[in-house]
Each structure stands twice: as C-alpha cells, then as structure tokens.
Amino acid sequence: MNKLLITLITFIFLFIYPTSNILANEKGLGVCPQERKTKKAPRIIYRSKNPLEYSSKNIKEGKLIYEKTARPLQCVLCHGIKGNGIGDPDFESTPSARNFTCAQTMTQVPDGQLYWIIKNGSTGTSM
C-alpha cells in the first residue's frame, strides 16, 4: 500500500474514529448512519489490514495529510476538521461526505476497503 494512504487511514482510525461514540451522539455532526453503494475492493485489498502501528508520529503524519497535503483536495475540506462529514460549505456534495465519527457506518468499513476508496474514489460521490 502507498505510505501516504496508509498514514491517512491510520489517522482516520486512530485519531478521528475513536471519538465516534461521543461525537456521533451530538447534534449537527453529520449523517449517521450513512448508506453507500461503493464498489467493493478486490479481495486481496479488501482483506488487508493497516500495517502502521498506533503512534503519535503516525497520527501527526496522517493529520498533516488529512488537513494540508492530500491532493487534489485536502480531506478536511469535505470531511471536516472533526471528520464528521461537515466540511467547507463550498464543497458540499450529494451524497454528503463520509462521517468518520459514525460508529454504525465505520465499523462496517475494513481498512482495505477504506484504502481502496481513498486511492480510487467512490462512484456517485465527490471522491
């Protein structure tokens, strides 16, 4: 897997997702749960696990990618600073951006599938 994508996945699962039980219950924090019909990743990718360990270095690198260096657009623009799917109103889309703080949704998305979506986009969405 591409190191930048792996670092971004690590940031999402280790920094944003652990707050999901708290954030998902607050009002105005994105659609939860979210239905998607995203194409399933090839089996070998779908079953792959995030190889990066939980560390402050990996979280810091993932946060930098999420907020500043991802291209063509930074993830934060659509997914929001809290990862709740509420980003810059100029980048709103239908369907709305994935709410990473929604445990009901994110527990159903394996590491490999998330990697596949970040790398290849998701048909019918802004990614």
Task: Report residues per predicted region.
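Bacterial N-terminal signal peptides that target proteins for export
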Residues: 1-8
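Bacterial N-terminal signal peptides
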Residues: 8-17
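Sec/Tat signal peptide C-region and signal peptidase I cleavage site
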Residues: 18-24
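Axial heme c-ligation environment in periplasmic c-type cytochrome domains
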Residues: 24-33, 94, 98-99, 117-127
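Electrostatic cytochrome c docking/interface patches
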Residues: 35-68
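Gly/Gly-Pro-rich "capping" loops immediately C-terminal to redox-active cysteine motifs
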Residues: 56-57, 80-115
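Solvent-exposed, polar/charged alpha-helical surfaces in well-ordered, non-transmembrane soluble domains
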Residues: 60-64, 76, 112, 116
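The canonical Cys-X-X-Cys-His
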Residues: 62, 70-82
